[in-house]
């Protein structure tokens, strides 16, 4: 299958929750380190810094080994059960965190983390109004897309009225 066929099937079968930057996005078949490869074997340098993979590199061997080791022991289990990897990671984070940050709450995605942060802030302050940065990206849920000010990253106009967008700081 070539890139054009993949793009066509993507458009046909996937819900358009987020608009793409390009008319013809790269149909990625492989990724290693900071490089992407399309269906035709063309190589591209991945400059997209908004996703965690680029900070450690695609198909990072050390990360892959750790994942395989964990999968061989325990793939997924409800957060209702305590597990050694989770409590060890929480303890490590608490020991690294400044001040009185002594509790962890793990989520499966950035969107879920943003939703949880909003919920915690509203519970703590009693306020329902939110301030989000104009150039921030928060995810694909309704609240997360409302926090996101880029129209191309939203499927719908902002639905949550209590959100105000502030200019992102310019440090240069």
Residue ranges and their predicted role:
Residues 83-87:
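PLP-dependent aminotransferase class I/II
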Residues 1-32:
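Active-site-adjacent loop/helix segments that line or gate small-molecule/cofactor pockets in enzymes
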Residues 49-50, 147:
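Residue-level structural signal for beta-strand termini and adjacent loop
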Residues 25-46:
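Active-site and channel-lining beta-strand-loop segments
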Residues 91-172:
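PLP-dependent aspartate aminotransferase-fold enzymes
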Residues 10, 14, 18, 71-78, ...:
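Structural signal for hydrophobic packing residues in well-ordered secondary-structure cores
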Residues 44, 50-80, 90-107, 168-169:
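Glycine-rich phosphate-binding segment of PLP-dependent enzymes
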